[in-house]
Amino acid sequence: MIFVYALLALVITFVLVPVLIPTLKRMKFGQSIREEGPQSHMKKTGTPTMGGLTFLLSIVITSLVAIIFVDQANPIILLLFVTIGFGLIGFIDDYIIVVKKNNQGLTSKQKFLAQIGIAIIFFVLSNVFHLVNFSTSIHIPFTNVAIPLSFAYVIFIVFWQVGFSNAVNLTDGLDGLATALSIIGFTMYAIMSFVLGETAIGIFCIIMLFALLGFLPYNINPAKVFMGDTGSLALGGIFATISIMLNQELSLIFIGLVFVIETLSVMLQVASFKLTGKRIFKMSPIHHHFELIGWSEWKVVTVFWAVGLISGLIGLWIGVH
């Protein structure tokens, strides 16, 4: 059945994207490009966004099929809740930007409050209503040490889900970058899940992986469609949730290393400018810095993919030992 889920997720996305692109163009749901960014990005202006709807719909449909046939499907139900929750936040943000022509979208406060709400509901469903059972301790790799947090673990969940949701969102600035890194990440977590005996989570990772494989041909340079916040916020939230449910939280630092680096580059840039009035990078997130020093977009993307693959393998090794 795993092959069926994979094929279904792949086909649904691959078929939906070319159907959605003309609709998005007709409705003028196009991406706005920052004027201070690399000049090579100006040609991307108007490229349809909100393409994440396609793979999210594929994930929802395929997961609902899987829930029918998979024993102990509660992990899939919970992951589906997180997918829809963070995806809905991203969709509303995209809608305000492209339909209401308000480049700010949701305010930072509105977005954070909504993300925190999803994270708290996830904790309640899992640890209060026991939809799934996972430890409320953070396990230190290569040791038998676990830091017990009990109900304070909800604070960690909020930090982890909100942090990685926004980290993937920051990374989604170059054609195919966030999509391919996510494919690498879900491949690692699929393997890890099956090795650890978490079959339902592994099946969900396979669904994620193949839904994104169906999207990648349309998102790779030159991109015909962008995933938008609809897709990126959901992907980051799912990554964090999977690492939590596997009790392998810290593996995500390596599996999602590029997302972490991109986020740190923004934080360092803002802190440096506020404290000294000077910028560390020509532009943040850091992928734009490399473009502005002369790297082609394709070079930046392929180097970041390579980093993601190597660090992902390290994260997998950490997770299964």
Q: Where do the language-model regions lie?
A:
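Short aromatic-rich membrane-water interface segments that cap or initiate transmembrane helices
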Residues: 45-47, 140-152, 294
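Peri-membrane helix termini and adjoining interfacial loops of integral membrane proteins
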Residues: 28-34, 90, 94, 130-138, ...
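Alpha-helical transmembrane segments
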Residues: 1-23, 55-88, 122, 126-127, ...
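Membrane-interface helix-loop junction between the first two transmembrane segments
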Residues: 19-37
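Juxtamembrane helix-capping/reentrant segments at transmembrane boundaries
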Residues: 34-48, 101-115, 286-288, 292
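Hydrophobic alpha-helical hairpins/lids featuring a short glycine-rich hinge
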Residues: 72, 76-107, 111-113
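Membrane-interface helix termini and inter-helical loops of multi-pass transporters
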Residues: 71, 99, 130-145
